[in-house]
Curated annotation (Swiss-Prot):
Protein name: ATP synthase subunit c
Lineage of the organism: Bacteria, Bacillati, Mycoplasmatota, Mollicutes, Acholeplasmatales
Pfam families in the record: ATP-synt_C
Encoding gene, per UniProt annotation: atpE
Family: Belongs to the ATPase C chain family.
InterPro entries, A to Z: ATP_synth_csu_bac/chlpt, ATP_synth_F0_csu, ATP_synth_F0_csu_DDCD_BS, ATPase_proteolipid_c-like_dom, F/V-ATP_Csub_sf
Highest rank taxon of the organism: Bacteria
GO molecular function: lipid binding; proton-transporting ATP synthase activity, rotational mechanism
Function of the protein: F(1)F(0) ATP synthase produces ATP from ADP in the presence of a proton or sodium gradient. F-type ATPases consist of two structural domains, F(1) containing the extramembraneous catalytic core and F(0) containing the membrane proton channel, linked together by a central stalk and a peripheral stalk. During catalysis, ATP synthesis in the catalytic domain of F(1) is coupled via a rotary mechanism of the central stalk subunits to proton translocation. Key component of the F(0) channel; it plays a direct role in translocation across the membrane. A homomeric c-ring of between 10-14 subunits forms the central stalk rotor element with the F(1) delta and epsilon subunits.
Subunit composition and interactions: F-type ATPases have 2 components, F(1) - the catalytic core - and F(0) - the membrane proton channel. F(1) has five subunits: alpha(3), beta(3), gamma(1), delta(1), epsilon(1). F(0) has three main subunits: a(1), b(2) and c(10-14). The alpha and beta chains form an alternating ring which encloses part of the gamma chain. F(1) is attached to F(0) by a central stalk formed by the gamma and epsilon chains, while a peripheral stalk is formed by the delta and b chains.
Length: 86
């Protein structure tokens, strides 16, 4: 079994395949980050609908949360671009 892994790690084809697999997983993570942002925005709109007087506080909190989620999505896309260029 060790011989199999030694041969596979030495081939360029196997390394390229793993790089593309990692890029695909990164794209999946970026897509899930987008879904999370949409859900957060939907909940913020519901909260403003229930308490319009707190809209400023809700909006600021939502924007900070969106920024934190967006950074992970951007990092995932950068990783995907790096891995797919190898």
């Amino acid at each position: 079994m060790n011989t199999f892994f030694q041969i596979m790690t030495q081939t360029e084809f196997f390394a390229t395949g793993l790089a593309y697999l990692g890029a695909g997983i990164s794209i999946l993570a970026a897509g899930l980050a987008g879904i999370g942002q949409g859900l957060a925005a939907a909940r913020a709109v519901e909260a403003v609908g229930r308490q319009p007087e707190a809209s400023g506080k809700i909006t600021v909190t939502m924007i900070l949360g969106q920024a934190m989620v967006e950074t992970s999505g951007i990092y995932a896309l950068i990783i995907a671009f790096i891995l797919s260029s190898k």
